[in-house]
Amino acid sequence: MKKQFQWICMLVVAFCFTTTLFAQNKKTIRVGVFQGHGGAETCIWEAVQAIRLDGDMTVRTFTTADIAKGVLNNLDAIIVPGGGGSTQYLNMGEENVKRVKEFIASGKGAVGICAGAYLFSDTPNYACFRINGAKAIDIEHDNRGHGIAKFSLTNEGKKLFPELATRPLSYVLYYEGPVFTPSENSQIKYTTFATMESDVHEEGNAPINMTNNKPFFIANTYGKGRVFSSIAHPEATPGMEWMIPRMVRWTLGLPIKQYKKNVVRPNVYNQEYLMTKADLKQEHSYYETFLYGSSEEKIAALDWLQVRRSWDAKRWVQGLLFDNSPKVRIRAAKFIAETDYLQYLPDMETAMNAEKDMQTKQAITRYVEQLKALLP
């Protein structure tokens, strides 16, 4: 009996040792999202929530002061989100720009989204890193418009995003991203992973046939590291946010990871929808609706805004979880859940717990569970 007990103890110790060793060998991918002046707050939120979809990754934000303090020593990859590229450059400061470039060249990864892609470019007369081999053209018409844009994958893109490989076109949110061509002044050569198929010229007197047939995703090596640049916003597109952690994996030379079916939903948008000037006017009017409109008007506004993936609505919907109309509260929860907005999960849970009407509480609870189900 004593020997049996000893054997059991030995087996337990061996199991614990093996489990600990496995956990140590399974390296966590440490990702940082730059949170500096010039980065749009919602773009920062969305980059963070996209990384949360990958169970092997941890994510934090970091500031320009954090760079100087050595935060890059504790990161494997960084993301520079949307906003204003040159403003982000100014906020970092030249010494920190040098530190970031050295970090990437040492064998680490970097993903630039929209303004981040601008920042990584080699654009003349523009404050940028000059690390992706591309230059932005037609900057004078940068405010050319936004909306759900279409793109096609190249052969390299199909390898990285096999979930989209059989689709002739896929769709994500575009918001005034750079129009790239190869830089004559750079020795860096990039690979195109996707091509922009939408011709965006709705605003700012932008010329036609400028954005279409231009790179949508590009990637390259930089020293021992890798850089991925996206001109558009998968992280802000329901069902497509998973593309961001996939890009991070590419920058680190890591194998792709399959994400859950409720995370990979490319059929949420199956057609182009570029916001017209009339749409923008309508969108702006709904701010007043949410302040002064009836419950029916608010619900109709949320319907319209969700279909068009309104850029502004994601800032307005948070407070509607606490509207005085139960129907509006439910519709706001539905909007947040169906747009994958994990940033508002704590608000959703608070609204659920504070709700007094049982039918409304049950409905909000369903949407809370739908949102939580996105997480690994």
Predicted regions and their residues:
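Amphipathic alpha-helical scaffolding segments comprising HEAT/armadillo-like alpha-solenoid repeats
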Residues: 279-289, 310-322, 341-353, 375-376
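Aromatic-Pro/Gly-enriched surface loop or interdomain linker
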Residues: 22-74
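Catalytic beta-strand/loop cores that center a nucleophilic Ser/Cys/Thr
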Residues: 149-223, 231-235
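Short inter-helical turns and helix N-cap capping residues of alpha-solenoid HEAT/ARM repeat scaffolds
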Residues: 293-294, 324-325, 356-357
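A glycine-rich, often tryptophan-bearing local segment used as a flexible ligand/cofactor-contacting loop or short
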Residues: 86-165
